[in-house]
Amino acid sequence: MDTLHHRFQQFQKTIWFNIFCYLWTGIFSFLAFAPVSLTHFVWIAPFGFFWLSLKYHGKYKKLFFHGLLIGVVFYAISFHWIIHMAITFGNFPYVVAILILLFAGLLFGLKFPIFMMSFSFLSGKIGRHSVWVAGFCGLLSELIGPQLFPWYWGNLAAGNIILAQNAEITGVYGISFLVFIVSYTLFQSNPWHWKEIIHSKEKRKQYLRFITLPALLLLTFIVSGIFLFKKWENVKPVKSLNVLIVQPDAPLSFRDGREIKESIEALMARIEKLTDEGAVRLGKKPDLIVLPEAGVPFFSAHKTEITTKVRRMYWDRFDSLMFLLANRYKANVFFNEIDAGFKGAPSPRNLRYYNNNVLYDPNGDRRDSYQKKFLLMFGEYMPFDFLYELSQQTGRFEPGLTHNLIRYYTPRYYTLAEKEKSPKGRHLGWTDTETFNHEAVRSYYETTRTEVSETGKFLPLICYEVILPEFVREFRTAGNPEFIVNLTNDKWYGATTESDQHMELGRLRSIELRRWMVRSTNSGISANIDHLGRFVGNKKTGLMTAEALSETIDVIDSPPTFYTQYGNLIPWLMLFLTGIYYLNLLIGIRRGKSA
């Protein structure tokens, strides 16, 4: 063991050791993250930080440099899909796509050098508190480090369903704090010290004192997680809804040699077929049919002066199909479209586009809509106008103005005959919309109209918004939703790990709010997630597939959770109080030296 230790010490002096540290943290972080989800590796992944912080202790420029390199390696391994996105979405050459990945690692991996420099500084000044310094610096880097695709160390640990329950109280940041505390404790418990700990009574006492508080913290999180899991597992739902998710695998563009009409016709027929097949598997009429973001790309079902004359985006056959699905099953249909409006006085310069979700009630009437508020930089807008010339496929979207919930409805029947009422002859289908205009389609179903009543409200999120815990909290001003619906289009990333990561990052919102989530994606991964963060029925759709997912979801009636009301209060409070404590210690140390 001593010989091995000596060799490792010699290895630490080489540049190869630095590369070893980059790869250690990058690889073990990837293995702990979705889709591999070997969560236990998260506890040793930060070792690379600790090794380099010891090697370059007090050398802040080198720590900053090596922290940046860890960020680049982490991004290259875990977020390699950025290359695919840059090529597919931005139409950039392969070399430029690689440069974009490297730039993303440098810019959005800043939390790594922030951790290493702050940890080196504080642990050098306050050595006996190093384990808590690790937690403090880890939390600090998570809270202030800039990110485009926000992920946190707590997300990696939240693959453990018990630890994940603590997100209701501490948010993901609290779990990140735990990760760094436990990781540094394990780091200092390495095999090199076992011999002296075993043979020395004094060393054993020191070690027990060292691990006592971290062990108690871990135990607290485990006990709290078990308590919260049992508490919410025993909560009885107030009602259930039959939900049908349609994953149509719509094309990103029409560049495969077929006519646009042929491609879009095939897509609309596929949506109708998937809905019918999903309803058959459900065995009863759905209450809610959910289509994904860009499930019908490039078009709008909103007939306005702007979408019909200024920009011809409205397509009556799109409008008709959504109307037909609502009436065929007397269900709510929630779907995505492109909408447009003027920002200020009507003029070409003031024309704006919106990523819009809208609900049609069981009569096919247009009801509430939600316009995406948190837009993705480089995807839905560019920070500077000249960048549009480099990526002409990037959208020019305007953020929505409100955090609003979506109301959904239930048809009210007063007699059996009224419930079984059907249109004259037969139900219309997609092919009929070629000969029936939208007004004719509505007229055809006029006799089947029924009274509907508002049943409840749900929280709508579009794509990227679901991975932003602070943003999702802002909907609390709109009321207490019954469940969450997330519409997403991840097709830009191909069959990469991004879809699994997107799903995993969004899963914690169900725990934070204690609400079930319906997640409908264009090309995968679609699923229903319960209020404990579990996949309902252990069902998920595949990637790059067209399929439907039918499931009954539960509605939990409970007041807003601690996290919903207070957000990251506990992590910020921990950071503030610990910071005050360390500042006081540093001042005391400085005064002691001057005396």
Curated annotation (Swiss-Prot):
Q: Mind listing the UniProt keywords for this protein, alphabetically?
A: Acyltransferase, Cell inner membrane, Cell membrane, Membrane, Transferase, Transmembrane, Transmembrane helix
Q: Which residues form the active site?
A: 293 (proton acceptor), 372, 463 (nucleophile)
EC number in record:
2.3.1.269
The cross-references to Pfam families, in alphabetical order and at most eight, read: CN_hydrolase, LNT_N
Q: Which GO terms describe its biological process?
A: lipoprotein biosynthetic process
A GO MF term:
N-acyltransferase activity
Q: In which pathway does it act?
A: Protein modification; lipoprotein biosynthesis (N-acyl transfer)
Uppermost EC category: transferase
InterPro entries in UniProt = Apolipo_AcylTrfase, C-N_Hydrolase, C-N_Hydrolase_sf, LNT_N
Keyword Transferase on this protein?
yes
Instruction: List, alphabetically, the Gene3D superfamilies matched.
Output: Carbon-nitrogen hydrolase
What main location does UniProt list? membrane
Q: Which residues cross the membrane?
A: 30-50, 63-83, 95-115, 167-187, 210-230, 569-589
| Family, per entry | Belongs to the CN hydrolase family. Apolipoprotein N-acyltransferase subfamily.
Q: Which HAMAP family match?
A: Lnt
What is its biological role?
Catalyzes the phospholipid dependent N-acylation of the N-terminal cysteine of apolipoprotein, the last step in lipoprotein maturation.
Query: Protein name, please?
Result: Apolipoprotein N-acyltransferase 2
Write down the species. Leptospira interrogans serogroup Icterohaemorrhagiae serovar Lai (strain 56601)
Its ancestry begins with: Bacteria, Pseudomonadati, Spirochaetota, Spirochaetia, Leptospirales
